[in-house]
Amino acid sequence: MDQQRLTHLKQLEAESIHIIREVAAEFDNPVMMYSIGKDSSVMLHLTRKAFYPGKIPFPLLHVDTDWKFRDMITFRDTTAKKYGFDLIVHKNPEGLAAGINPFDHGSSKHTDIMKTQGLKQALNKYGFDAAFGGARRDEEKSRAKERVYSFRDKNHTWDPKNQRPELWRTYNGQINKGESIRVFPLSNWTELDIWQYIYLENIEIVPLYLADVRPVVQRDGMLIMVDDDRMKLREGEQIEHKSVRFRTLGCYPLTGAIESQANTLTEIIEEMLVATSSERQGRAIDHDQSGSMELKKRQGYF
């Protein structure tokens, strides 16, 4: 990796740390969304840098759908214990009581109830006025047009036509009671930037990002990993063991793996250099209807 690339990453790092510190100073009750993925791991690392040697001055929130990969939950709990940050785990109690799951209720309903409504419940319960997220503009077209400070009304909904100008590095955090801001410090990073930064900073990640032989089934054009005994096989489906890894992580029945032999960070970076598709190709929730992600964001999804 040449000096120019290092300089580029240091510029991104400085911008992100500036945004994180700005929010901590400007808002009364911020929170960081911690989804356990690679972007969350980078954002957590940047946050620890931003306030070092002090502790992170706000809690981390994980909205748990009860369908995350087991490796993700293990990694979450281990990381929280290692760094001693304040971790809030919220599950939608109504969704759990109703037995909402991606198999019987589909990706759209499952995501709305267990993620979107669960997130809104947690934000209301704790009264957070700003919430950090690890979304990047290169991931998906609706995210590409979202501001760093993304205004949300009292119902947590997003109106892409009602966004505030962001000139240079000046962000408008003025809100009325009940309104909030979603903040995206990694907006200008790319997937390749994330992986190179993870490599350079030696950031720990969930093992699922590295290739290994795993049990999978072919479903709807994706390789779905059989992560526990709740996996419901469709007629004709056969479990195969393939060398796969994940570019993105979510609920395991809705997240597709890719066939890969890349089991080191350098090999992942080499794959990224020739990749021609978005990592979100492996997320079923992005394809359950036309304009799916923008509709979800309008309803309160991250």
Swiss-Prot record:
SUPFAM superfamilies: Adenine nucleotide alpha hydrolases-like
Source domain of life: Bacteria
UniProt entry keywords in alphabetical sequence: ATP-binding, Nucleotide-binding, Nucleotidyltransferase, Transferase
Biological processes annotated in GO: hydrogen sulfide biosynthetic process; sulfate assimilation
InterPro entries according to UniProt: PAPS_reduct_dom, Rossmann-like_a/b/a_fold, SO4_adenylTrfase_ssu, Sulfate_adenylyltrnsfr_sub2
Keyword Translocase: no
GO terms of molecular function: ATP binding; sulfate adenylyltransferase (ATP) activity
Enzyme category, top tier: transferase
E.C. number(s) listed in UniProt: 2.7.7.4
Catalytic activity: sulfate + ATP + H(+) = adenosine 5'-phosphosulfate + diphosphate
Pfam families xrefs: PAPS_reduct
Region Disordered: start-end pairs: 280-302
Subunit structure: Heterodimer composed of CysD, the smaller subunit, and CysN.
Function, as annotated: With CysN forms the ATP sulfurylase (ATPS) that catalyzes the adenylation of sulfate producing adenosine 5'-phosphosulfate (APS) and diphosphate, the first enzymatic step in sulfur assimilation pathway. APS synthesis involves the formation of a high-energy phosphoric-sulfuric acid anhydride bond driven by GTP hydrolysis by CysN coupled to ATP hydrolysis by CysD.
HAMAP family, alphabetized: Sulf_adenylyltr_sub2
Family listed: Belongs to the PAPS reductase family. CysD subfamily.
Protein name per the record: Sulfate adenylyltransferase subunit 2
Gene name as annotated: cysD
